[in-house]
Structure formats: structure tokens, C-alpha cells
Regions:
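Alpha-helical elements of Rossmann-like donor-binding domains used by nucleotide-donor carbohydrate transfer enzymes
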Residues: 12-19, 92, 96, 125
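Short amphipathic alpha-helix that is part of the acyltransferase structural core
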Residues: 1-30
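A conserved beta-strand-loop-helix scaffold within acyl/acetyltransferase catalytic domains
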Residues: 21-72
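Conserved beta-strand-loop-alpha-helix junction that forms the acyl-donor binding cleft
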Residues: 109-134
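Short glycine-aromatic motifs
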Residues: 2, 38-39, 127-133, 138-140
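Conserved acetyl-CoA-binding loop-helix of GNAT-fold acetyltransferases
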Residues: 72, 78-101
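Short, high-confidence coil segments that cap the C-terminus of an alpha-helix
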Residues: 38-39, 103-106
């Protein structure tokens, strides 16, 4: 059974990430997680095992970033389980964070990802998957490439309709 708990990640998990070969491991320290900028920071569990984490980050104006500093543990990174690919951030964390933002009066959110080998294809596949789980009254809208804190990223708006 999956559940979300709002808390900071346990230090043992951050230590495991720091000693791993994860190419983004420098983002996953208490300092670099930017917890002070998070409206909420969510840990996703399956029973008593941590699946991953991400935050809903305050941004410019009345905007917030969904799935900021998202990390999924290696045990849960996969392509298919029982013939279905599970994208934990989009099935569990994003819907939770969108609902938190809605309760606080947000009507415009976004998420972004660094540009990888197949940027548009990856973004489109993620939107298609995430749309299955988006809370009622919200929609995803792909924006293309934007500068986010000095890094060129692919961006998707999440808008209250």
C-alpha cells in the first residue's frame, strides 16, 4: 500500500544517495533540496519502504513547481511491472502536490526536466501518463524549452481549468 508523508528525507537515505553513482546526487543534500522553499516536501512509501521523494516548491509570482528535487530509489526505478510502467512521481506525488496547491489557492503550477537525449518525446510520454492521474479540473500544457534558474529545461504548465 502506498502512502505519502510530509517530512524531510531521512539522513541515511541522503547518505546512500551521496555514496551512489546517481548523476544528480549533488542535488540531494539537505542544503540543495531547498526545503525552506518547499510548500510541502513529500516522501512516498510502499508499506515501510521509501519509494522516493519530491517537493512542491514556491516559485516566482503565484506559481509553484511540482515534483521539485524528485528522487526515486533504485529499487523502484523500472520500466514495467506486470506489463505496466509505473511512474511514481506522476501517479502519486504530483496529484498530492497539486491538491495541496489547490487548497492554498494556486491556479498555475509547472514542472520541468533537464534536456535529455529525447526531450520532446520524453515530455510528451510523461504528460500522456500523468494525465491519467491529474486531479479533476487541472490540465497539463507543454511549454517547450525555458530557462529555469540558469538551466535550460523543458517545461510543462499545470493549469486549473
Amino acid at each position: 500500500m502506498f502512502k505519502i508523508i510530509e517530512d524531510k528525507p531521512p539522513q541515511w537515505l541522503l547518505d546512500n544517495i551521496a555514496s551512489s553513482t546517481d548523476k544528480l546526487k549533488s542535488n540531494y543534500t539537505l542544503e540543495r533540496l531547498k526545503l525552506e522553499q518547499m510548500i510541502c516536501f513529500c516522501l512516498l512509501y510502499e508499506d515501510d519502504k521509501i519509494v522516493g521523494f519530491s517537493g512542491l516548491q514556491k516559485f516566482e509570482g503565484n506559481t509553484a513547481r511540482v515534483n521539485s528535487r524528485c528522487y526515486i530509489t533504485p529499487e523502484y526505478r523500472q520500466y514495467k511491472i506486470r506489463n505496466e510502467r509505473v511512474r511514481y512521481p506522476w501517479k502519486y506525488l504530483a496529484p498530492y502536490q497539486i491538491k495541496v496547491a489547490e487548497k492554498l489557492g494556486y491556479t498555475k503550477l509547472f514542472w520541468s526536466t533537464e534536456l535529455y537525449k529525447r526531450p520532446e518525446k520524453t515530455m510528451n510520454l510523461t504528460i500522456k501518463y500523468a494525465t491519467q492521474y491529474i486531479p479533476e479540473g487541472w490540465q497539463y500544457k507543454r511549454l517547450g524549452h525555458k530557462d529555469i534558474n540558469g538551466v535550460k529545461q523543458e517545461v510543462c504548465e499545470i493549469l486549473k481549468s
